[in-house]
Swiss-Prot record:
The gene is sepF. This is Cell division protein SepF. Residues 23-41 have a biased composition (Basic and acidic residues). Belongs to the SepF family. It comes from Caldicellulosiruptor saccharolyticus (strain ATCC 43494 / DSM 8903 / Tp8T 6331). GO terms for cellular component: cytoplasm. Residues 21-41 are annotated as: Disordered. It is found in: Cytoplasm. Keywords: Cell cycle, Cell division, Cytoplasm, Septation. One of its GO terms (biological process) is division septum assembly.
């Protein structure tokens, strides 16, 4: 009959009101019928697991090196072939990719004389120790020492 504010006011001035015993079925029934509009899922997916993409590029011009770096930035494994690139551009391409590798904390590995693999930091790539030592001594990746 009285709402909460009126009841507090009457109690303040010293008048007490006794409540009538009413069945409280209606409030319980209302509570049971209330359903959340949208149930939240208990499991949240963070990302796609184990879906690593490998991209292969056969570069011909220096301007195409941007594709390699963009794919690396998208966390893709990149294999690129420099066999059709002019000799004076090969070192420029390797320098450009090496800069991207450094900035993105990735790794670069030489597969053959003009084929390279670049992997993002979230992926481990095993390289044979003998092959690794050969690359270090030849000076292609002297900064790996």
């Amino acid at each position: 009959m009285f709402d909460n504010l009126q009841r507090k006011f009457l109690n303040l001035i010293g008048i007490e009101i006794e409540e009538e015993d009413k069945p409280q079925e209606s409030t319980k029934a209302k509570e049971e019928n209330v359903k959340p509009k949208h149930e939240t899922p208990k499991v949240v997916t963070i990302g796609k697991a184990n879906q690593t993409e490998v991209t292969v590029y056969n570069l011909k011009l220096f301007d195409e090196v941007v594709k390699v770096c963009d794919a690396l930035r998208e966390n893709k494994i990149v294999v690129f072939n420099l066999e059709q690139v002019a000799e004076d551009h090969i070192q420029r391409i390797i320098d450009f990719v090496s800069g991207a590798v450094y900035v993105l904390d990735a790794k670069i590995h030489k597969v053959s004389k003009k084929i390279f693999v670049v992997v993002p930091r979230s992926i481990d790539l095993e390289v044979d120790e003998q092959l690794k030592e050969e690359f270090r001594t030849k000076g292609v990746f002297a900064w790996l020492k």
